[in-house]
Amino acid sequence: VLVYDEKGENPIVTFHDVEGENQTSVNNMTFDAKTGKHKIYVLANVGSEDAAKEYTTEQALLSKQIESQEPMGTEMMLGFVAKDMETSINLYNSGNNEVIDITGDASFAAKVVPPYSKITFKITKDLPSDKHVYLAITEVNVRHLPVKYSLLPYEKWTMDNGVSGESIISLYE
């Protein structure tokens, strides 16, 4: 857990070494922070406390580019800490974390997100209101997996020749 001041500097790092089955579902994790306004992140699979301390500013963390010759499932994952899970997800998707004012003990939420292999489809078509379209994707084959990725999402490709109208495919590099 990285707790930056309101300017995105002076991090307080709380490192938890999580092993075994607990890796995929961590709840009730405590972290150190001073009262005041902060931007808080969860960084999974960072490796060590020393590695986490290398992110001396929020900008250094968010601009991190990581290379991996093939995805192993152990790459770093980033989560934005917020008052609830929905806000955490929305902040991550926007790529902009908000300042949290810590006045005492409190509960927060963060969803950590894998940095690649997220595929999003958006299919639009004008239909009468009483019609429905069902899309069942049973298999997705990805021919070129990324070797370099960032911790934040961005829209990579837009394809205009979709099955029914516009299709947008969003991948993490």
Locations of regions flagged by a protein language model:
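Tryptophan-paired
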Residues: V1-E58, K122, L127-E173
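Structured interaction patches on ligand/partner-binding surfaces of diverse proteins
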Residues: D17-Q23, E49-S107
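Beta-strand-rich interaction surfaces with strong enrichment in secreted/lumenal proteins
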Residues: N28-F31, L78, N97-E98, A109, ...
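Exposed beta-sheet edge/beta-hairpin loop segments within beta-rich domains
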Residues: M29-K34, T103-V113
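A short, Gly/Thr-enriched small/hydrophobic beta-strand-prone motif that recurs across taxa
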Residues: K111-D126
